[in-house]
Amino acid sequence: MRRNGKERKDRTAGRPQRQGQEVAGRAWIFRGAHRGRVTRKNIIWHELIGLKAKVIRASHPELVGIEGYVLDETRNTLVLVGDRVWVVPKDVVEIEFDLGNEKIRVNGKDLVGRPEMRLKKRWRK
């Protein structure tokens, strides 16, 4: 569409179209003080945003090996940002979270659900 002889743009100039694209490659953003509180027992209920994650196993072979920091979390997906932005489905992967001094493997099916709803779930201990 043209207005006053000029072409309209779909988005603001200089801004990326995909969420998280502007922080790709900037790992320093995710250094937080909350990491010490995450343990093997409470990671299912804990906030995942900001944690370093790596896909260990997946039903789709291209997902294996993706690593980065968790940028966003929805009901069925995790958005990982490393050298680029990846949207990873939770229910088909096994994810390893790196907490600095320990690595925790979690089946993605245990993470399915909105973060606030996972708190209400009862898990067998």
UniProtKB/Swiss-Prot annotation:
<dbReference type="GO" id="GO:0030677">
    <property type="term" value="C:ribonuclease P complex"/>
</dbReference>
<dbReference type="GO" id="GO:0003723">
    <property type="term" value="F:RNA binding"/>
</dbReference>
<dbReference type="InterPro" id="IPR002730">
    <property type="entry name" value="Rpp29/RNP1"/>
</dbReference>
<keyword id="KW-0963">Cytoplasm</keyword>
<dbReference type="GO" id="GO:0004526">
    <property type="term" value="F:ribonuclease P activity"/>
</dbReference>
<keyword id="KW-0819">tRNA processing</keyword>
<keyword id="KW-0540">Nuclease</keyword>
<comment type="subunit">
    <text>Consists of a catalytic RNA component and at least 4-5 protein subunits.</text>
</comment>
<dbReference type="GO" id="GO:0001682">
    <property type="term" value="P:tRNA 5'-leader removal"/>
</dbReference>
<comment type="similarity">
    <text>Belongs to the eukaryotic/archaeal RNase P protein component 1 family.</text>
</comment>
<comment type="function">
    <text>Part of ribonuclease P, a protein complex that generates mature tRNA molecules by cleaving their 5'-ends.</text>
</comment>
<feature type="region of interest" description="Disordered">
    <location>
        <begin position="1"/>
        <end position="22"/>
    </location>
</feature>
<dbReference type="InterPro" id="IPR023538">
    <property type="entry name" value="RNP1"/>
</dbReference>
<dbReference type="GO" id="GO:0005737">
    <property type="term" value="C:cytoplasm"/>
</dbReference>
<keyword id="KW-0378">Hydrolase</keyword>
<protein>
    <recommendedName>
        <fullName>Ribonuclease P protein component 1</fullName>
        <ecNumber>3.1.26.5</ecNumber>
    </recommendedName>
</protein>
<dbReference type="Pfam" id="PF01868">
    <property type="entry name" value="RNase_P-MRP_p29"/>
</dbReference>
<dbReference type="InterPro" id="IPR023534">
    <property type="entry name" value="Rof/RNase_P-like"/>
</dbReference>
<dbReference type="InterPro" id="IPR036980">
    <property type="entry name" value="RNase_P/MRP_Rpp29_sf"/>
</dbReference>
<keyword id="KW-0255">Endonuclease</keyword>
